[in-house]
Structure formats: C-alpha cells, structure tokens
Amino acid sequence: MDTLMRITDHLTTSPGIQLKIDKRWGASVTFVTRSIAHVRIFDAADPQLDRTWSISLGSNATPRTGLGPRDLLDHSPAPAWAGNSRDVAPVEDMEVTTTVTASAEDTASHPEFSGVYADEPVDSPDPDEKSFIVGTDSLRVIIRDCPLRMTWQRRADDWVTASEDRPTGAYEIGTHTGRVAHHRVRNIDDRYYGLGEKSGDLERTGRIFDMRCLDALGYDAGSTDPLYKHVPFLMTRTANGAFGIFYDNLSASRFNLGAEVDNYHRPFTSWQADHGDIDYWVMTADHLCDLTPQILRLTGNPAFLPRWALGYSGSTMHYTDAPDASCQLLKFIDLLREHAIPCDSFQLSSGYTTIGSRRYVFTWDRDKFSQPTDTTRHFRDAGLHLAANIKPALLTTHPYYRDVAEAGIFVTNSRTGEPATSMFWGGHGGNVDFINPRGVQWWKDNVRHQLIDMGIESTWNDNNEYELWSEDAICDGFGHPVELDRIRPVQALLMSRASFEAQREAAPVERPFLISRSGPLGLQRYVQTWSGDNSTSWRTLKYNTRMGVGMSMSGLVNFGHDVGGFAGTARPGPELFARWVANGVMHPRFTIHSWHNDGSVNEPWMYPEITDIVREMIRLRYRLIPFLYTLSYLAAERREPIVNPVFSLDDTLHEESDDFLLGHDLLVASVVEKGQTTRTVTLPHVSDGWFEFDTGVHHDPGTVTLEAPLDRLPLLVRAGAGIPQCELPAPSGEIITTRTVENSPHRIVLYLPDGNGHSQGFFFDDDGHTNGYRQGHGYWLTWSADHTDTTVIVHTHVEGDYQPSWGTMAFALRPGDERAIKVVADAAQD
C-alpha cells in the first residue's frame, strides 16, 4: 500500500478544512459538534462508497439535561433506505477556526505541534511541509504532512493530546488491492476498550481483532474471534482522558491493538480494511464511559421497547423441532403455571418452518401446526407474546425460490446475473437483498401475511451474517449497484428495519419489539440483540458477562445472553444453571435457550432441587421491572446505558471484573466460578458507600467478601439511591407477566446513609407499549429525601397525565432502617 504524503492543496471551510493529498487523494475534516469531528480520505475522482447507513445525526439530536416530559430527545430520522451522504453538516452553532502554518520552521514555533515523542524517527524537516490547526473551543486537530498525519487535542485546563497518528506513516491506500489502513501512536499508558461484541476481557489491549460477521455456533467466549456483529468503535483510556474513534467502513477489517511491533516504527495501533475509503469519526471525553452517549448521538438512540420485552422469554430449538411441536409449545404454558414461573414471551425457533428435514422461511409445517392461529391464540390467551425466527436466505429447494429469483430479489452474481448462492442450513440458498426496494417489500409482505396475520406479533431476525464470500456478489443498492463485500453488515441492519416497519405498519400504535443477531452500529435504533449461539460452560458465563459490558459501552445497550448456554454436548448442571439464571435476570434481555447435542432442553424446572431458586430469581427480576423499565427509558431518552462497568463510578477500578452496574445504583456481583459460596467484591469509591440489597448491611468502598450461597445473588445499592420495585402476588396457578407488574403496588426503597443528608432520584412509567409518553401521556416522578438520625422526609414531584393502575407511589426504607418516614407530594404541573 502507498503511504499518503504531501498536502498539495487546501481549502478552509466554515466547519473545517478540505485537502488534496499527493495531487490525487481528497481529504476533509469536518466538525459537526464541539466535540465530534469527521475525517474522510478518499480517491477524489472515484470515492469507494459515498453513502452511510450507520450515521444518524440529525439537526435536532441535541443532548438533554432534564428529566421531565419537556426534555425528551428530538429523535433523528433514520438514514434513507439507500443510505445518506457521507458529507454530514454541523448540528451545533459553533465557531471552527483554522490556522495555517506554511513551513516546518513556523511549525516548530508552536509548542502545541510537538508530538508525544521528542525524537520522532522522521527525516529532517521539509521546508515545504504544511501544517494546520483546525478546531472548536473543545476539540481541535493538528494536521501535518510528509507524511500526512493528524494529532487530536481536547481542552482540559489547557490543550492536551488525546490521539496522535503514527509520524512514520499514518494513512495507507492500496491502489491495486483497494485495502486501506490507519496507524496511530500507542502510548505506554493507553488502554483499549470497545469494539462491541468481542470475546475475552473487557480491556482489549495487546490483541488483534477481526471485524467480520460469522455464524459462530458454540464459540469460546474467552477467545473466539470474530463473532456476529460489526462495531468498529474503539475507545481509548489515555493519560489525558478518553478518546473514541468510529470507522464508518462496512467491509471486513482488522484492529491491531499492540500485538504487532515493527523496528521502523514507534509502538502503534492499526486499523486496516479490505475495501472502501478511510472514513472515521473522533470524539473525546473526560472519562471512558462518557464516550457511550456520544456514539449513540452519532449512530442513533436505542429503541424504547415495550415493557414486556423485560420479562422472561422462553425458547429452545427442541420444541419446534419435535414432531408434536404445537403440543410441546402448549405444554410449556402448562408448565409455567405448574411451577409458578413468571413469563412474558416465547421465541419460536425455526423448526416451525420445516418441510422434511429443511427449513424454509415464511412457511409453516402443517404437520406440526395444522392451524397456526390455534397455537398463537393459546399464547395470547395466557398473556404471552410470540416472536418467530426468520432467516434472510431461501434454499434453492424452497417453494418460493424460483419466483423470488425471477423477481430479482436476491443478491446477484455480477458475472452471470443469477442469484449468488451460499451454504445455508443444510444446502445452498439465495440471500434476500435488502438494499433493493423489491427485497424490502417482499420481506415486509411476508412478515405481515405469514407471521403477523397468524398471530405472531414480533420477529426474531436470525442467521443474518450474510456469509456469501464470492467477490462477484453484488447488491442492487437502490439503483446504484454496490459489491456485497463493501456493505455486508448493512443487509442485517436493513433486514431488521424491514421487519420493524412491517410490525409497525400492522400495529401503528405499538412500540415494536424485535431481535437481531447480526448487524452494524445503528442496529440499536430498531432491535434488541444478544451474544449469539454461546456454549454451555462456566467459562461462557464468566466471559459473556464481560462481553456484554463491552457491547453496552460500544452502544449496543439492549442485550442479553442465552442463559444456560445454547450449544454443547449437554445441558448445564444444577449449580451452573442456577448461577446463570441469577446472572441473566440482571441483564436487559433475559432468555433461556438451548440446542444441545443430547437433545436435552434448558428449562426453568429441569432440576427439581433448584426450581425454587430459579423461580425466586425470576421473581426478583419481575420485582425490579419498574427499575429496569426506568433504565430502559433513560437509555432511549438520555442515551444512558442500562449496563455499565464498575469503573464508570470509580476510575481506579479498571482491573478486570466479573461485576457490573445496572444504571449507576445497583452493583451486580454474579458468581461465575464453580463451587464458590462467597464472593469478593471491590466496591467503587462513592459517597457514603454501599448497602446490601436484601439485608441493608452497610459496606464502605473497597474490598469486601459477601455470602453467596446458591440461592443468593449478591447485589449492592449505592448509598443515597432509591430502587423502584413492585410487590408481586404470591405464586399461584396464574402466570405472572409484566401486566401483573402494571397492576401491583409500587414502591421506591430508599437506601439512605445514617445521619444527616440529602438524596434524590427519578422514576418513569407509562402504558408500557405505545409512544403516548411523547405527547405527555407518561408518569415522570422525581423525588428528594432529606434525612437525619431519626427522620426521613421525602418530597415527590410528578409530571405527565398518565394515571398508573398501581396507584400512588409508596416509599420505604432499606432493611434495618427504623427511622420515621414522611412523604410530601408537591403540586403536580401540567
């Protein structure tokens, strides 16, 4: 590849600067906000891909600071189906200044141009070297050439360097291969995070990661790479704060985060992609976790899913693969009642589509389901929702294959004009092209007629990695053909969007719930996701937990894992399953799923000796749904992740941990090691320490050891917090669902420190399934508590016109707190 060297022309613009490099390459730096900038480097005569599907930064996508109905985000419109222009205009009023320095001598007079290393291994200064300072009052870039390189600085007390390109060559383009690369300096204290769904530890330093989407059945959560999703968002913790870089390139790529060394270069990191242009976004912050709201602002707010999405969702391949699939499914409802297991939905695996031994999307196996609507009605009558598995490929033996091929709906072989086929679930098949209006419409029609009309209200978008590796595979591109290799993850994104729109068109008032396994950043605008087909082991439990925190930090905030492990030789033993359920109930998505070699099934009641434990863990989740629902609202409307690393509260806790936070108030200390009955936890340094959730016992920040028998999940509440909960009815023959939660008494349990103090908090509720809250039909409650040694006085303030069926919010004190409590309701506001 060729290294980009000299700036041969430039033009200053109001939001940045445009450059000509080596008389051939175009480059631009555009500041879209005070703290987010966009860099493009491309062939000026022939940009490789002039569209983006990931960026969703509208003119009204400004942050909000309040918590009331007037503080809702003005959501940005989704990118056009055909993609948006990569030239994004600023969305904030700001001044961008440019300083031009024409020579190396002048450059030397500016101390802010000094690199990280005083002895940079470059040739003697070129008298014609050009340099520029471009930026806002918060973020700026220093651009130099010979070779082309950039240094990013953020304003702290003074300007400090956040990231520096490699001075011995930063940008490379393969004029024959089409590959591109970007190299940056790696400082000794830099630590790397992000990249979405990745195996191993939360910190990525010292590893190499592939960014490709694969169907990684039974992967090792500690080491397998790549996995299912395309999230090229790298977060760096530096001595001068946090730096984020998002590569808006959808081809297969590779990150070297310090695994490579080269005598001719200082320590460096690299990003390299097979195709496309060098197109990236930079952002800075004081702390690592402050980057997450910024990447969400850039790529789109998380969908606000219906309340029932927080309930337990049953699933297994076994039921729908069985010859008596309908009976197996109906038996599941009976077993929920028999064992008093709360539940809200069931995910229908693809066995409902079989004809013989093969699976054909958008068909029903009438031997298993003579009347599909009879089965779906039983679930609806039980208060349970159904989500059906759908896959974006049709085997060549599919009854619709010929018609779909003739309609030009598949990804095409550019040489033959025929469908480009690939291996897919027991045969070769064609892949639906969602960058094609005919493919989108065909998909939406079939979701409506084959699923929704049959009583299925949600879709489970699966096996959408598009492992079609022919270099001749080409997509319609909405009239502008584009090679699949350049945009592969977009297919999963637009598949999810097509399913989303089909569901919304069928039920315009409802907030759609759907799931997708694969896709790029931007996926969070439509779906919930999960970590794919994991395997049954203690190792998976441990590393899926870390994987999930990494996904959340990277912007995929609504996620979960297959509890019990999807793949493996057999189901988990009782101890592992109990610990996995305890871990799973504390994630945004809680699903028990399986497809084991021995035909066994992961079910809540599969071990009678621990069924009571499993039931109580699931009931604990349902008690906490008011808390989880508030966190879901804050994710959608404040871009606050539901799951956070413990170092989001304490910058000294960057060592690897099996703990995580729900919001910023509840610390989850899962047991992930076999045979453990105690759990050692390092508590973040916060004012007044922490309380055990169930006992009210207080702990100062620092390391503590907690009792963790099999029936106990150690949970700790930040002192001063209030945890919204509901009071569930006793177990009975009726299935507890989130509708039960909506009709059960609510209370906020205050975990206040002893003595004098002041605390405050927030709670949100609405009807749980529509967007009426955006017109004020919600319940926004803020509370403040003033406390002494003997009394607690709580002031509440409610906005919105929603009248919850659970009545008036009650307040209670943590276990062991005997102070008198008084609640004073302030006058409501319209």
Pin down the residues of each PLM region.
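Catalytic core of carbohydrate-active enzymes
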Residues: 501-502, 519-529, 551-561, 568-792, ...
